[in-house]
Amino acid sequence: MGCTLSAEERAALERSKAIEKNLKEDGISAAKDVKLLLLGAGESGKSTIVKQMKIIHEDGFSGEDVKQYKPVVYSNTIQSLAAIVRAMDTLGVEYGDKERKTDSKMVCDVVSRMEDTEPFSAELLSAMMRLWGDSGIQECFNRSREYQLNDSAKYYLDSLDRIGAGDYQPTEQDILRTRVKTTGIVETHFTFKNLHFRLFDVGGQRSERKKWIHCFEDVTAIIFCVALSGYDQVLHEDETTNRMHESLMLFDSICNNKFFIDTSIILFLNKKDLFGEKIKKSPLTICFPEYPGSNTYEDAAAYIQTQFESKNRSPNKEIYCHMTCATDTNNIQVVFDAVTDIIIANNLRGCGLY
């Protein structure tokens, strides 16, 4: 999934230049407030988008941020390994080397003692590296759609020697990939293209959704995030529901909500990198039995996009769709630039200037 500019992105760039020229000519210099609501099911990448705004539109992560994320990286790493270890039993997978059972006990003990946010001891690090290298663990990892596993598990476990080093400091990418469940509403402020943005990240799990209603007033646009890679997975909070089906249901209720009759909806079909890898091995018919196409990235992604767009029951509402990879700063920068231009164009249209 390279980052060369697509035709869509080139067109967005041209549009961007034209809009900026129009703004200058019309002398519209007063910065406007833009209220963006970031919605989507749990683990769709909303909080990662917020972190990207910090990198792109603020000054990135401070020394204090790095310090705060360090224990989260330790926890995400060992908790991911512990989840695979637990699944070994559930799925009945054997270790490649029976000696690994001792290592797995050590990992699970650390987690059960709630010491998962601590730096790894030399002994624990060795045990974790041996486990991650075990053929049984790898077989179990390859079946991760059958249990709940953090998307960043492989990223962190492949970096064990770096994360386990005594002088370890989280990199920007390490921080972008951290997973902490969002509870409540997180608000971020930044200025871009003469607009004051207020971005609201709202918890995606079902229990969090009742808190969204307070944010609904005067929303300029909604960014709705979907994890493309969730098509063959079930929810954390309800293991009978497919993640993609849940996203579609939620999108339907947001898109056709009376509060949002005149609100622009921007659809981020996210985790395109994970989806591109997964679609080679896991057919889309798992989620959409009626899917007639091939299991290529292009065909499958286009089909999913159509499924979401078809939920829109308003003939006057346009859904602006982007394929995204929230952990890729360049991709999010280009996409957010295009999103901002849509907002500016809609604002100007509202004033009769565009």
Curated annotation (Swiss-Prot):
Q: Which reaction does it catalyse?
A: GTP + H2O = GDP + phosphate + H(+)
The annotated region (G4 motif) lies at 266-273
User: Whose protein is this, by species?
Assistant: Mus musculus
| Stated regulation of activity | The GTPase activity is promoted by GTPAse activators, such as RGS14, RGS16 and RGS19.
Tell me one Pfam family matched here.
G-alpha
Task: Please state what the protein is called.
Answer: Guanine nucleotide-binding protein G(o) subunit alpha
EC primary class:
hydrolase
Per the record, its GO cellular-component terms are: cell body; dendrite; GABA-ergic synapse; glutamatergic synapse; heterotrimeric G-protein complex; membrane; myelin sheath; parallel fiber to Purkinje cell synapse
